[in-house]
Amino acid sequence: MTTLRELGTRPRRSQAWEPGSPEIVRFITDEGASYGFLWHALIFGAYVPEHETLFLQYGTGTVIIAGPKAEEFWEDFIQRKAISVKADGVDILSVTMSLRQRKEDKVE
């Protein structure tokens, strides 16, 4: 039987993301940009297994996380067990941000 102490000290699932219970989740992109969003501001999330890719949509754009452990990150994320994520080249291969286009920037 697992004790409460053991639950609090379980090993990290990956070095690519930081465990914790956040109010703000931080995404560090491949380009070095850092985006922070309130955890509950997520509009939509989808994991696509055939591409090992997770899409997290926020008001300003979509965070795209790719890699063999993207689904495990998603599982931790939805349980509020992840504070930040960045590519480590092994478990998470890429973290990118696709910003929403502003109305005035759209080409007609």
Positions of predicted regions on the chain:
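Short, surface-exposed polybasic-and-hydrophobic patches located at secondary-structure transitions
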Residues: H51-E72
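Short aromatic-glycine motifs in intrinsically disordered, low-complexity regions
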Residues: P22-G36
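Acidic surface patches and DE-rich sequence motifs
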Residues: T29, V48, Y58
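Helix-rich interaction surfaces within compact, conserved domain-sized segments
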Residues: I65-E108
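Phosphoinositide-dependent membrane-docking surfaces
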Residues: F37-V48
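A short, compositionally biased
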Residues: P19-E23, V48-E52
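Anionic N-terminal interaction surfaces
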Residues: M1-G20
